[in-house]
Design a protein with these regions (language model features):
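Conserved PLP-enzyme active-site core in the AAT-like
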Residues: 15-217, 221, 227-230
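Metallocofactor- and cofactor-centric catalytic cores in central/energy metabolism, strongly enriched
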Residues: 1-7, 15, 138
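A short linear hydrophobic-aromatic micro-motif
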Residues: 8-9, 156
């Protein structure tokens, strides 16, 4: 697999990154479970999924008895590793990491930072699930979070891995048993990945995924080039 994961669920049935994340969260968490987000407040669309104050949508994790806590980032926007050492414990079923800055101005995470978070999480709570919202992060570095300890990474084919060609879709990649649970959530228990028509989108998926590293590389080069120009104005 491209992300060095045991298994993956790649489907056009995922209508957005938020939908894919929702399936992953509900696939893994059960009533009474606790999740801890270690990268501050998630971006807006995920707040409704979690059921944060002011965004307590019908059907949220909170409504299903799944509790949420978070560790805020440091003033410079980087992870607070010391607070993670204090707060992470076996009571948390999931440690949630948002790799991208989302709609804020904090820096996105490097894979090496995710590796450090995963190491702390597994040391403090060996049975926890380390889940990474990998949207906008695919192919930005030579390795992915799944290479450095993340149990599950989630993203959208409309973004980096679709290469600008995939019109819809998302993916969940990680440990086999976790992916199976997500597949049961997407379709139904007992069926999982074994059902569902592709509806003619596979060509754009294959072409987009093939082109994705080149497209992302070009975007990175363009961003660096533009930044250099504007620095000199």
């Amino acid at each position: 697999y491209a992300f060095e994961a045991e298994d993956a669920l790649v489907r056009h049935n995922f209508v957005s990154g938020t939908h894919t994340l929702t399936v992953a969260l509900f696939g893994m968490l059960r009533p009474g479970d606790k999740m801890l987000c270690v990268t501050g407040t998630p971006y807006d669309t995920i707040q409704g999924v979690i059921g944060l104050p002011g965004r307590e949508e019908s059907g949220s994790l909170k409504e299903f008895g799944i509790s949420y806590e978070q560790i805020d980032l440091l003033p410079d926007g980087t992870p607070d590793y010391e607070e993670m050492e204090r707060r992470i414990s076996p009571e948390f079923r999931m440690i949630y990491i948002q790799r991208s800055r989302g709609y804020s101005l904090r820096p996105s995470l490097f894979v090496r930072e995710i590796e450090r978070i995963a190491e702390i999480a597994k040391r403090k709570a060996p049975e926890c699930i380390v889940m990474v919202d990998n949207c906008y992060g695919e192919f930005v570095e030579r390795i992915e979070p799944s290479d450095v300890g993340a149990d599950m990474i989630v993203g959208s084919l409309i973004k980096n891995p679709g290469g600008g060609l995939a019109p819809i879709g998302g993916y969940v990649a990680g440990k086999k048993e976790l992916i199976e649970n997500c597949a049961y959530r997407l379709t139904s228990p007992g069926l999982g990945k074994e059902v569902g028509a592709s509806l003619g989108v596979m060509q754009s998926f294959y072409q987009g995924f093939f082109m994705a590293p080149t497209v992302v590389c070009g975007a990175l080069k363009g961003a660096v080039f533009a930044a250099n120009i504007y620095e000199k104005l």
